[in-house]
């Protein structure tokens, strides 16, 4: 398997895993969602330092994952203040 295909599979698996995790969380557990998101982001940052460049995500991809998570939080939480607080909490 060539390096480009390896990277594509890695990114797809990462996005699928993130997406399925967020869909399993109920709209009432916003704090759980934020903690899980923070763990994912911490893990991604760790991957930036220990894996070869083929597996590294660029800053734009990390930001896109944050935005997807923020959109999920917004869609599943009807308390605007809690949503804004969560978005501030996970944003760099």
Curated annotation (Swiss-Prot):
This is Non-structural protein 6. It comes from the Viruses. Pfam families: Rota_NS6. InterPro entries: Rotavirus_NSP6 (IPR006950). It is found in: Host cytoplasm; Host mitochondrion. It comes from Rotavirus A (strain RVA/Human/United States/Wa/1974/G1P1A[8]) (RV-A). Keywords: Host cytoplasm, Host mitochondrion. GO terms for cellular component: host cell mitochondrion. Its main location: host cell. Belongs to the rotavirus A NSP6 family. Interacts with NSP2 and NSP5.
């Amino acid at each position: 398997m060539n390096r480009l295909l390896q990277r594509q599979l890695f990114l797809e698996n990462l996005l699928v895993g993130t997406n399925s995790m967020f869909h399993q969380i109920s709209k009432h557990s916003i704090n759980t969602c934020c903690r899980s998101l923070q763990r994912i982001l911490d893990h991604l940052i760790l991957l930036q330092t220990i894996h070869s460049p083929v597996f590294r995500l660029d800053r734009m991809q990390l930001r896109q994952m944050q935005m997807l998570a923020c959109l999920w939080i917004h869609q599943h939480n009807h308390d605007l203040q809690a949503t804004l607080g969560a978005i501030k909490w996970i944003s760099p």
